[in-house]
Amino acid sequence: MKKNTIILVGALIAIAFMTYMLLSINTRKTEQVLLNTTPVIKEKGVEARSDIWGKEYPRQYDTWKKTKDSNKIEDMVEKYPQLAILWAGYGFAKDYNAPRGHFNALQSNINTLRTGAPTGPNDGPMPMACWSCKSSDVPRIMERDGELQYFTGKWARMGSEIVNPIGCADCHNSQTSQLEISRPYLKRGLEASGRKLEDLTFQDMRSLACAQCHSEYYFKKTPYTDEAGNKQVAAVVTFPWAKGLAAENMEEYYNEYGFKDWTHGISKTPMLKAQHPGYEIFTTGIHFKRGLSCADCHMPYTQEGSVKFSDHQIQDPLNNIANSCLTCHRQSEEEFKQIVEEKLKRKDQLNVIAMNSLANAHLLAKKAWEVGATEAEMEKPINTIRSAQWLWDYSIASHGSFFHAPGETLRLLGVANNKAMQARLELQNILANHGVTDYEVPDFSTKEKAQKLAGVPFDKLVKEKMRFKKGMVVEWYDEAVKAGRLDKNWWKILPDNTAYPQN
């Protein structure tokens, strides 16, 4: 009897195990069938709503939603008050924060003091182009209206249309789900640099999907005639890659083009503002030269059951060292962190030195103008300041440059500081020629002091922004929900952090 019981129990266990294995195999077969079947997200056009994509790609969607977790605000002007001096007369002197996750991109764009407080669709300081890297609605509108039409007019014109943050449609085709370049200006930039679009590989695309936004650009005024026969001018995002992707190549391009982003509010220098040349500086680093892509480190593959997929919580790889870094590097996590921290310390040290040199140069130039320096006297130091600040800005504007290309980053900071020091010496000589030998620049050691010197009416800007957020922005989202462009529960999950008090 006991022997029969043992046999029966053993048989039941074996049957249960075989049943489990059969179900597991069938489940994995079902998963593989689903994986090998590419869904059509939208028959025609661009599906900008990532939650619609999430119905077919739940794993990718769930990890993408985690990008909202990086919602902490780091006020870079508070951290580095020199920035208000360096960008005097330009929007970044008002407000500049460290980057956050893609989920937060659209709200950051609306909240920043740089975009102002429009009272209607045709006013405000910024053009339509300032939405271009913030929303998956951008390729939808470009396809529907045309690229030139999209780039025409003020930023506030499309507030109720551009309501979905960076998401699936920015990088993937809505019919095939394949990686694609959704911004035509990147295609033009690649062709200008000598790349053939037909030669791009899948591995290329795993970086170029990012390069659509993480690149240097300027707004090129482009005249055209609309369908109604009216003359229009579009401010088209343009990549200055015709002479190459290096900082000096772009500087040469801008100089030949006679381009300036703005005239400096303190030194009167015709300035260049680097945007976020992450891709360009990445191409000078060891990871790119070894064949790695952005996605290899920022979107490492992960496993769920039999399904292998890219983690769409795009973030600092140091938050996921085991999957992002230690697949190639052989250090422990702690040792690897220490190596990266050393690289960052070196960059930070040179960065502060360069910023201080540049801030002093701008303030010395202001004094030189005040005591009667001529344009002929000022031409050389002003041009030196322009070049120095461009190289400095290019080296740090993408934030991750110290890791992507540490050698190039340190080189650029060194050259920038050297040029800034040259400008300071030239300006000291000019001041001496005008009888000023003991001038000390004013204190810019805090955000408040630096913004005052830069002429930033901070409290006024915040008051205007809050009026805008409580009025026009609410109207934008209400209209978007009614039109079906946005889920009505959006407000419940949307982080709304700012570097300024929201009273």
From Swiss-Prot:
It catalyses: 6 Fe(III)-[cytochrome c] + NH4(+) + 2 H2O = 6 Fe(II)-[cytochrome c] + nitrite + 8 H(+). One of its GO terms (cellular component) is outer membrane-bounded periplasmic space. Heme c 4 binds at residues 294, 297-298, 404. Binds 1 Ca(2+) ion per monomer. Transmembrane segments: none annotated. Heme binds at residues 130, 133-134. Ca(2+) binds at residues 216-217, 273, 275. It is found in: Periplasm. It is an enzyme of class 1 (oxidoreductase). One of its GO terms (biological process) is nitrate assimilation. CDD domains: NrfA-like. One of its GO terms (molecular function) is heme binding. Heme c 3 binds at residues 102, 210, 213-214. Keywords: Calcium, Electron transport, Heme, Iron, Metal-binding, Oxidoreductase, Periplasm, Signal, Transport. Heme c 2 binds at residues 168, 171-172, 312. Its cofactor is Ca(2+); heme c. Pfam families: Cytochrom_C552. Pathway: Nitrogen metabolism; nitrate reduction (assimilation). Its EC number is 1.7.2.2. Residues 1-16 form the signal peptide. It comes from the Bacteria. Substrate binds at residues 217, 276. Belongs to the cytochrome c-552 family. Catalyzes the reduction of nitrite to ammonia, consuming six electrons in the process. This is Cytochrome c-552.
